[in-house]
Structure formats: structure tokens, C-alpha cells
From Swiss-Prot:
This is Translation initiation factor IF-2. It comes from Synechocystis sp. (strain ATCC 27184 / PCC 6803 / Kazusa). PROSITE patterns: G_TR_2, IF2. NCBIfam families: IF-2, small_GTP. SUPFAM superfamilies: Initiation factor IF2/eIF5b, domain 3, P-loop containing nucleoside triphosphate hydrolases, Translation proteins. The keyword Cytoplasm applies. Coiled coil: none annotated. Residues 493-666 form the tr-type G domain.
Amino acid sequence: MNNAKVRIYDLSKELNLENRDILDICERLNVAAKSHSSTISESDAERIKAAAEKFTPQQPKKPRVASRPESKEDKSDPKQQKILAIHHKQEKSGGPSPARPTPPPRPKLQAPKAPTPPQPPVAKASAPKIQKQEEPAQEAPKSVAPPTQPLAPPPVPSLQSPPSKPAPPTPPAKKAAPAPRLAGPPGRTASPNKTAVPAPAKPKVNRPEIVSLKDNRGQARSPGDREEKVAIAAPEPPKPKVELRRPKPPRPEEDENLPELLEFPPLSRGKGVDGDNDADDGDLLSTEKPKPKLKRPTPPRLGKPDQWEDDEDEKANKAKAANKGKRRPKMDDDDDDLDIDGDNGPKPTLVSLSIARPPKPKSLAAKPSTPTVAKVKKPTLKSEAGSSAGGSSRSRGDRRDRKEVVQKPEVIMLDRSLTVRDLADLLKISETDIIKRLFLKGVAVQITQTLDEETARMVAESFEVAVETPERVAAAAKTTEMLDEADLDNLVRRPPVVTIMGHVDHGKTTLLDSIRKTKVAQGEAGGITQHIGAYHVEVEHNDKTEQIVFLDTPGHEAFTAMRARGAKVTDIAILVVAADDGVQPQTKEAISHAKAAGVPLIVAINKVDKPEANPDRIKQELSELGLLAEEWGGDTIMVPVSALNGDNLDGLLEMILLVSEVEELVANPNRQAKGTVIEANLDRTRGPVATLLIQNGTLRVGDAIVVGAVYGKIRAMIDDRGDKVEEASPSFAVEILGLGDVPAAGDEFEVFTNEKDARLQAEARAMEDRQTRLQQAMSSRKVTLSSISAQAQEGELKELNIILKADVQGSLGAILGSLEQLPQGEVQIRVLLASPGEVTETDVDLAAASGAIIIGFNTTLASGARQAADQEGVDIREYDIIYKLLDDIQGAMEGLLDPEEIESSLGTAEVRAVFPVGRGNIAGCYVQSGKIIRNRNLRVRRGDQVLFEGNIDSLKRIKEDVREVNAGYECGIGCSKFNDWKEGDIIEAYEMTMKRRTLAT
């Protein structure tokens, strides 16, 4: 021992003693040592060595020898002895069933409570162990497997047995003599027989397992258990060993190793394996003689048990830190092995020791018994449940498959673009099937990619599912009924809402100005209307003042949505047609909007004061569109007017009022307001502003309103003449302030009495709108990732980034719709931002980062925006007429196109002579047309065959080099790469020029 500190287990190896013996000596010498891994000083080690010389010859050698015959591990020895003692007691109690093995050991155990008698039974028990050890030693795993298998099949009986088994330990505790202890556990008679036979085989296989199990239970065991283990080891050797057992108090230190064995036997008893009983009994009877064989090989195994003990002690320390429950499943198997080993050990001594610790085994045995039984059951249940669950899951999957096949729809409705996942859900098939089907057709898609209606239809039809497309609802169709059943009792007449529609420059706004006696048209940029105007007019009719609300819609083709929106909310439509221009495309569109909205139509033939006016031609053209004038036998009212001179305006107003009376226009003013957004914009000083048309109810300042997905509380209302009003009745249009955001034109609004409900409704709608926008954005992308990469490699991918700011929401939608109509095959338009309001510095920053141009329509620049744009080099274009805006954007797109290289002919010449010069030849030519220019391209033709294409390297007239030769002159043409000139050849001179391409080409 050269080290300053010496470990207990090193000392035990040096002295050839067991760790527990060294610990006993330490305790007697008052040396502080808790476990085999504890360290002591060299002086203490010398004291222990001196004491060990007196102490060791009896205890350490004998327990080791005993452990060797019973099991190859020392740990198994004490376990076997204790178990044997307990099992013998059980054998006595349970003698009737296993009569053969039990009677011989019983008298020996009872009479010699002293250690001497236990030795003969040990020999008998060990004999059967020898047979099993010899046979299963070769097939150790097999011997282990059979006990575990029987445990699994009878989980229920095992549950019943454990409760009875914990009870028996109590009676042995009460009895002081070892014999009564044997009588105590009678219910375990079956298990002792089993354990006695398998004990020899299991110690070999389970030694490592027993170690781990001991470690787990050794932590919870009490010092009494250690005493029992020591007692077990002593009885097997001669009587002096029993005398050594007297120092039981010091043995509590051995608890770490020994108590584990004691705990396991009760647990195993509780488990009791019925299947092993009969076989074990037979083995015991037949194999009593081979015990000496087992004892003989034990001496060479001395080294191994020490190592095993050390390992067990180390594992025990680790087990203390770990959770006991985790290793309990292993303990179940080890418990059975321990029971088997215990049958062979000296039962009387074990019984006496176990009696001293009865209360602890109860709690310990009771607690582990339940988990052990449960653990035995759990694997079986899990395996059974797993198989059953697997079968059930498979059956469920089969059912699902069957259901899917059965539920596969025969017809589906496609009204929009769908993602692959949505289409799969609709068709009740797997997404991978759709992806495979498209891949086979040469279309590579992802599960989240959006498919257009045509592709979705193709996929559905390929799966033999019919596709139906719902009827398209016209944009002008009225989809919402503003009147409720509750309004029927409070209905009153309301003014008619009249929408003026027609082709651009046919005089719509001028007609309205004449009626209102205002000058609106003069204020319009370019003299054309570019957003809806709402005005109310008071008219004298039948000695009463009647009110009419007019909506003026744009006539330009870009404002189709505005015209549809106007027709949707109108009661009467006035179609203005210029008498000198006739029916135009927007005239036809206005007629279709009026028919879709189902509103009566009045035709105002304008500009009848012009000399070239021809009202009859207008009536003829309208009749071809299904509008037959009343004077021609039809039902369409046609009124000739002159907006500029005010001719026959009264007749037009009278017809409007007559039609409104026939239509019976009513509303309930005594309810919360409902209506439609005519226009919306972002004002730099007032914030979001919306023009609302009240179609039912009364709108008041302070109302909580939800416009589409926008919530707001009305702060102010302004009528068409700029005056503030406190309330607005049905059919009136007002501007409101106080919205949280700019709503979309055409959205319907509703007033709520509770602000909380209004906010919740707005949030829900905002979420729906967001999903719709995302889907539209995905479906509207004309460039996919695959096409982008392909075009980028070919240098064909070009994009024009635009930031669009407009005065009102309606104009914004019109411009975006017009941009979509532009050809975008080679140049894509990317609208990074489109919003109403003025151009801000934030817009400039976005444009600078993305290389976009800013387009402002009827809007202004915020303070600092112009300076920021100049600093960042951002181009800001301002427009007030949509024609110019669209033309400039188209020009910008064409500017991104690569110019086209075309061939431009210069002239032709005929070869009339060939002159050899040096190594080559010179063609003497006569210029027939155009001119020949040096360093331009030429093409040599001989008959219908092209012989050569190259450059004109030299051009001479007479002997002087010239740059060009005009028609009618002779010249010499030389080409370094062509000398095969012949008279009669035709030389064509041309050059390649770059021409700007257009979007159409």
C-alpha cells in the first residue's frame, strides 16, 4: 500500500477477503468506512490487516466456498441460502403438494436450528443444482428464457399470488424459532420447489442481472437484511461459521450488497412461477448427489466473486443516484432466479434472520410485488395490445381506404384556383397521386402550389371525376338584400339612386352638371371622369320637391369595375349615347351591367344639337342590342337631350321619377344603417375617407361601423356639397371620417350597437380577406420557380417593379386591372405596393431598395419625398389621366425587351469581270441598285444558290479605295475569304440593324 489512502476493495483483494468482512473489521476497529469504495489511511489499513489475520480464516473463506457451489457469484450464495431457508419452511407448510422433496429437509431444519443441520440439506439441494448447472450451463440463455415465458402467459394468477405471499412473511416474523418460520410461508410451497431446481442454472445466466437488481434494492434495504445475508453464508460451512455470525450489528454496513438478495426472494415468491414447479421438483429428487461436484470447482473461482462483489458495490452506488423504478423490470426476472437459488441454501438460518426483519420485508415486498406483477403483465399486455392495436390500426386504415374509395365523388365544383392539397381533399385522394399524375404529364408541382382551373379540371377528369363550373355571377348583380322582414312594418318611400353610364366623352358628367347646375366636368383631368361621384338633386315634380341621387361613373374602359359597382347599387340606370358617335364598346358594357343588376334602363341620346347628330341611327343600333324604343313598339324609354344647352332635361327628370314610382322604392329609416361603399381614399389631413351610399336605415355620427374588414367609429359626415351633417337617411351618399383603414370600394357596411361585436366582426372578416388575398396572389403569379430559373439562364427574365399610389381605392383597382391586360410574356410587372394616398419617403425607400419606379395617379408627394427621391435616384412619375399612365408603362416594358436584330438591304451588284490580284481575285462589278458600302455584309448568289456570305473587305473605284459606290457605277469588290468569282454572279450588300421591339411582337 504505497498510496496515502487505501480503498476498501483494494484491501479486500490484497487480503483475499470479501468487502463485507473488511467493513465488519473496520466497524469493530472504529475505522470510518461506509462502502467498498471508501478510502482509509495506511495506518488504519495496517490495523485492519492485523485484525484480519485473526478474523479471516473462518468467515471470508467459507462464505466464498459456499457461494461457489451454489452459484458462480458470491452474491448468489447468500441469496441462495436465504431463499433456501425460506423455501424449506414453505415446503413444510406446503408439504402436501410436493411431498417428495420436502420431508427430508424438514426434520433437519427444525431440529438443528443451530447452523450444523443446514449443511446436509444444502448438499442435497446443491445436488439437483449440479444437474441443472451442467445441462443449462451450456444453454444458459435457454434456461433463463423458459422462466420468463411462463411468467408472461399467466399474469392474472401471478397477481393473485403476490398478495398471499406478502402475508406469509408476517407469521414467520412473529415466530422466534426457525421452524415456525418455515411453517409461515406455506403458500409459497410451489415456488420453493421451482426455485430449488432452476437456482443453479439461473445464477450462471443472471449473475450480471442479479448484481444490478441488488444495487437497486440494496439502497432501500435495512441493516437487518445484511445480517441475514451473512447468516446465509455462514450456515453452509461448518458450525464455527455460525459462531462468527454473532457480530450481526457490524453487518449493517454490508447492507449495500447483501440486503438486495434478501429483498429479491420475497418479490420472486410473490411472483411465483407455476410452470417451473413440477420440473424443479423432479430435478431435486433426481439430482441430489452431484453437490460435491459443484463444491469442488469453487476454489478456483475465488478471484471472480471478489471482482463481482466490487462491481456490484460500484453499481449499487450508481443505483442510489438513479431511480429505482427504471430497473425494476429487470428485477422481476432476477427475483425468479433468486427464488431458485434460495431453495438450495440453508433454509433454517435464513428463516431466523428473516424473522428478525419481518416488518421491512412486508413493505418492501408488498411494494415491489405489485410493480413486479405489473411489470410482468405490462410486457405481455403491451405485446398483446401492440399486436391488437396494430391489427386494429390496420383494420382502421383498411376501413379508411374503403371509405375513401366509396366516398370518391362523382362530380366536383370548381369555382376558383386550388392548391394541390385542396384538390386532393376535394377528390378524396392522396396528394402524391396528383403530383405523380401531373409529373407524368410533364408538370412538376409541389403540394402547396396553386393549380389553375384548367389544370385542376384536367387532373379531376384523369381520375374519372366530372367537373362542374358554377355560373359566373356578374359583377353588377345584386347579391345582398338590404331589407329584412323586421323592416316591413316601417317602410317609407326613398329617393331613387340613378347611375349615369355610357362611353367616354359622350357627355355623362356634362349632363349631370346641367342637372345640378354645376361645373364638375371642368375640374376633371383631361375632361374625363376617373372616379364615381355621388350627388343629390332636388327636382320639382307635381308641385312637390322630389330628391334624386345621381352616381356618375367613368366611361373609360379601365373603369369597368366602377361601372359595375355603380350598377349594383342603383335603382335606375341612365345610358348616355352621343347622337354623333353611336354605340361604342363601353356603351355595350353599360347595357350588360344594367341587365345584370336587373334595373330599368333609360337611354339619354345626347348631343342632339350637333349638325351631324342622327338619333334614329342610335335607336337602330340599340335595337340590335335588345333595346327597342317605345315609339318603335318597345319598352325602353329613350329621351333626346342636349347636356350642353340643357334641352329636354326636364323631360328626362320626369321620366326618372315616373320609373321610380313604378319601382316602389322603399326603406326603413328607423333602424341601423346598411349600405355600400361607393369610393374610398386616404386623405393626407383627414385620414381614411369613404363615400357611403345608405341603402337602408339611418347613419349617424358616433355609430360603430364595420366596412368590409375595417372597423371605425364615425367622427364626421360630409354631404356632396361639402356641408357637415349629423345623420344621413336612405338613398343618400355621404363621406365619413373615422375609419381605421381605407376600405375597398364596393364593400358593404353595417352599423353595430355594440363596439365589441363590431371589432370582432371586423377581425374575422380581415382574416378571411387575408386568406383570399394570399390565394389570389399565389394563383396570379405568372412566373414559377422553375420558369424563373430557366428564363434566368437564358437571359429572358425581366421584371418591371412598380409602386402605385392613387387618390382613391377605385382608381387603384382600375389601374391594376389595366396593367394585367398588358402582354407579360417576356416582361413581368411586379406591383410591390398599391395603396391610396400620397407618395411618402417610405415609398421612396422601398423603391430604392427594389429598383422600382413610383407612379402617382391624381395624388401628391408628402414633404421630403421629392428630396429623398432625388437623393436615392428614384424615378417618380405623376399622372392625372389613365391613358398616359398606361402608355408610359407599356413603353417602359418595351424598353426592357432586347432589341431585335434585322437585316437591312443596301444594294445589289453584278459581276462582269474577274481580275487576278496577287493570290486572290477581284470582282469587277456594276452596281444595279442601292449602294455598296465597304465593311458591310455581302451575299454571293449564283443562280438560286448562295455561294458565300461574308464581309466586303475592299472596295475600289478605278484604282482608288472608296467607302461606298452608288447605283450606276462600276467598282471592284474584294473578299479575303472568297475568290471563286464568275461573271454573272449577283452580289447582295446588306447590314444588320437593331430595331426596338414592342410587346405585341
